[in-house]
Every structure is written in C-alpha cells, then in structure tokens.
Amino acid sequence: IRRELFNSEELLALPALGESIELLGLLACYSAPAALFMPDGTLNPDLPRYLSEANTLNALWLKVSLGHFSDAQPLEALRTLLNASGMALVVENDQTDCGQLAPMQRFQTACRELALPVTLTFDMGNWLWVGDSPEEAARHLAPAVSYIHVKAAVPHKDNFRAVAPDRADARWLDLLGQLPADAPRGIEFPLEGADL
C-alpha cells in the first residue's frame, strides 16, 4: 500500500482499510515516500506516524528510503521506536545519492553490529539510476534483504526506464537468483497489454 496514493481524507479512512485487509485475509506492506534520516542525519520526525499508520493497516512492515544516514548515533532511538510500535522496518535503495551502495552498506553494517532488526528492500533497477552495479549490490547486501522490488531497467533518453525482467536481457533474471529466494517480491514495472 503506497501512502503517496492517498489524499488527506483517505488517510483518515486507514482504520476501515485495515479492517478490510484483515477480514479478507490479505497481507499488506506499507510504503511511505519518506527518508528514514533527514539531511542533518537525525531520524525523520514523521516516522512514528508512519509506523502507526502501518499498524492501523495491519501491515507486515513499513518501507522507507534510507535518506541521509551519517552515523549510528540515532539507531538506539530507532530501536526504541520500533520496539514501541512492534512494526518491522525495511529500508529501500532509492534513486537518489542516498540509495547508492556505499551508504546502504554503511547502514546495513551499523544495523548488524547493533543487532537492530531492520532489513532491506532491494530495488533491482534503482542501482542503475545511481550508477551502481545491481550484481555488486546483491553480493554485498543479499543477506540483509527481506523484500525485493522486481524490475529491470533499460536506457531511455538520458536515464533509464523500468521494464519487466523478461523483456530485458538475462542479467535481471540472473540477479533474482542472487537474492534470497524466500523474500517476498513486489512488481515495480509497468504492466501493459497482454501482461494485464
């Protein structure tokens, strides 16, 4: 469930949506279009609200981007928030400099050293947007990955365009094989025509 698709009135109806999800026996994850860390390296002050919304939806986890992680100092405060909420947190490599392999590795290493229960969303195509190798990212981050955004990326004008992995070269399907087989996968490419 993508928070950015809700207007303010619809956000007030999250409890009803959460009830429907539970009634229908569905599983959901909640994605907030926000960074975990602010430009000054502090935790996003809206994180408690996002965690609460995820709980209201009975989501399996809250997904955010990394943002400006600089050091481990705020991670104990993050632990406190996560323990209080009972919500799992996954952090995605986005299409900004903050989503590059080096900061993602630093964050993942800090979480591992502090035994902080935060895992990663591995967006397969986003690595190209930030100039990194998806395969190298998989080699370094796969053990921490708990959710995969499945998409391939092909050059398009001055950037890239997301496409289905089976519409691109074999590299993308090979990449999936380097990631945890038991990690849930979300579609992150356009569905068109016969794919619908």
Where are these regions (language model features)?
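Conserved hydrophobic residues forming the short capping helix/wall of the S-adenosyl-L-methionine
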Residues: G18-I21, L82, C111
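Histidine-acidic metal/acid-base catalytic patches
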Residues: A13, P45-N58, A72, A77, ...
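Short, surface-exposed alpha-helical recognition segments that flank or form part
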Residues: M38, T42, Q95, V163
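Active-site beta-loop-alpha junctions enriched in small/polar residues
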Residues: I1-E4, S31-F37, S65-F69, E92-T96, ...
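N-terminal pre-domain/capping segments
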Residues: I1-T56
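Catalytic cores of phosphodiester-bond-cleaving enzymes
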Residues: D71, R79-D97
